[in-house]
Amino acid sequence: MLDMKFVRNNPAAVRDALARRGVSVALDEFYKLDEERREKLFIVEQMKNRRNVVSEEIGRLKKSGKDAPEMVLEMRDLSRQIKEIDEEIKELDGRLQDMLLNIPNIPHESVPEGAGAAENPVVRTWGKPRDFGFTPRPHWEIGEQLDIIDFERGGKVAGARFSFYKGYGARLERAVINFMLDLHTAEHGYVEIFPPFIVNRDSMVGTGQLPKFAEDMFKLEGAEYYLIPTAEVPVTNLYRNEILDGEKLPILHCAYSACFRAEAGAAGRDTRGLIRQHQFNKVELVKFCRPEDSYDELEKLTADAEKVLQKLGLPYRVVVLCTGDLGFSAAKTYDLEVWLPSYQEYKEISSCSNFADFQARRAGIRFRNARGKTEFVHTLNGSGLAVGRTVAAILENYQEADGSVTVPEALRPYMGGLSRIG
């Protein structure tokens, strides 16, 4: 959430930021309501001052043995009007707050201009796509032929975009999760969290999923609880409405969780395989830091996610999202895209974002600085990585002509020394 004072005092900057994003927000209505609120505040303060004067005068007259019936009536009338206007101000506050919750973050000055994903600049690439010497098969065919992933029964039991891992498939999924967690905790300094997979509405508002993206969430019927779309939600809200010790920043957490997404806007895209499932596993990286450090921390977080792909030997590239492709809460984002031979293109496997104080302001996460004053932390997160997409990339990039799949060396200790599936 943006700072109310900033939005009020910098209308040109806010309009420019929204124009850069290519989004439309009813700012005229916001400023109209804000002006109405300020006018009512001025009026009610005048009334309260008058009521205080009248009250003091009534008290003075009573001490001298005199009655003041007209003043008593005036004070009652003032109190009634004050109550009414206070209620109107409260209603305006709620409407303004709702509008603020639907205004996206302001892009950082380093974010490139662009209308959409096609205009995201490539920052760097790593690795070289393999020359197979045969036509590579898609991961869903590999998984089915090796009998390690069952999409048909996933559809029978749960519906479209669900699957079963079985045998070495289940073990490979678990190996990838444990490998990622071990790497981030042992080498990158993250403290592991195992979070709840269900959160309340305040948590979803805190990280920016609600109210704007309600249709993409799985809500529990009859309750204000939601299945998490990412571990970002519970881990960021771990410190909601808290004041952190500035000397302990940055705080680094990693977390494995299942993730649940309705994918309401993804109809017709990646309908086969593991790329776009309603339920999938992910290892998330979350940081809380001082404002002046957040963009350095974004570079480090991105490098931590990249290290997973490097150790697995998976070719990838890093793109920086342009203004038109930037997520609602993010000030700047790098996407990691892994090479998938069957698509003959790179597919997103991680988004690493700096949210500046946008989430912290919504969630009330502050720290006490060296002067003893509180200010909002900056929050960052990124996938470290999406597990299903990592498995898909392994199956496709490590497939062999005989139908088997070579297990990446980094995963063999987690697979009981197994070097090949099939």
Swiss-Prot record:
Residues noted as binding L-serine in the record, renumbered to the chain: 230-232, 284, 383
Reactions catalysed, as given in the entry: tRNA(Ser) + L-serine + ATP = L-seryl-tRNA(Ser) + AMP + diphosphate + H(+); tRNA(Sec) + L-serine + ATP = L-seryl-tRNA(Sec) + AMP + diphosphate + H(+)
Its EC number(s): 6.1.1.11
UniProt-listed GO biological process terms: selenocysteine biosynthetic process; seryl-tRNA aminoacylation
Enzyme class: ligase
Keyword Cytoplasm among record annotations: yes
Alphabetical keyword list: Aminoacyl-tRNA synthetase, ATP-binding, Cytoplasm, Ligase, Nucleotide-binding, Protein biosynthesis
Keyword Glycoprotein: no
Signal peptide stretch: none
Assembly and binders: Homodimer. The tRNA molecule binds across the dimer.
Domain comment, as recorded: Consists of two distinct domains, a catalytic core and a N-terminal extension that is involved in tRNA binding.
UniProt name for this protein: Serine--tRNA ligase
UniProt organism field: Pelotomaculum thermopropionicum (strain DSM 13744 / JCM 10971 / SI)
Taxonomic lineage of the native organism: Bacteria, Bacillati, Bacillota, Clostridia, Eubacteriales
Gene: serS
